A protein has these predicted regions:
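Short active-site oxyanion
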Residues: 1, 30-33, 65-67, 101-105
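Short, well-structured N-terminal submotif of metal-dependent ribonuclease cores
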Residues: 1-35, 47-58, 128-130
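Conserved glycosyltransferase catalytic-site signature
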Residues: 7, 73, 92-93
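A generic structural signal for short hydrophobic patches within well-formed alpha-helices
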Residues: 10-11, 40, 76, 113-114
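Acidic catalytic patch
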Residues: 42, 64-85
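Acidic, metal-associated active-site segment
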Residues: 43, 90-105
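Acidic, PIN/NYN-like endoribonuclease modules and their adjacent C-terminal/linker elements
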Residues: 100-130
Length: 130
């Protein structure tokens, strides 16, 4: 089953965060993942800022083992419509539009995706539960 794991899921998995075990099953098979280039941007920027460029490039090598989806005019326009409809930021709208366009589930722990169609939402509130 193909899925799109949001940037927050990649970061949880890469840093062995508290929710990493919830994201790991979705990231186990890189070839079944869809990764829009805007997600690569977010991930590279975060890893380079928080760690270093060498590790950021290693993470990009991982994402390049997935099905990388470039930004097209059709995706940009669809993302704009979704942004207006759901009040999503630019990158979040592109990520959601990519998942919807390719008919895959978006897996995320970002609150603004909760309740949207075709989203597997992993709530952060699990962090405070025993």
């Amino acid at each position: 089953m193909e899925v799109l794991v949001d940037t927050c899921g990649w970061i949880e998995w890469l840093t062995d965060g508290i929710l990493s075990d919830r994201f790991e099953p979705f990231l186990a098979d890189l070839q079944s993942l869809i990764v829009p280039t805007c997600l690569q941007f977010e991930l590279y920027k975060w890893v380079k800022r928080e760690r270093n460029e060498t590790l950021a490039m290693e993470v990009m090598a991982l994402t390049n083992q997935t099905q990388v989806i470039p930004l097209t005019t059709a995706l940009a326009l669809y993302a704009a419509d979704l942004s207006l409809a759901h009040r999503l930021s630019f990158a979040d709208a592109l990520i959601y539009a990519t998942a919807r366009h390719y008919e895959v589930t978006l897996v995320t722990s970002d609150d603004h995706f909760a309740g949207l169609a075709d989203v597997t939402y992993i709530p952060k509130r699990l962090l405070s539960e025993p």
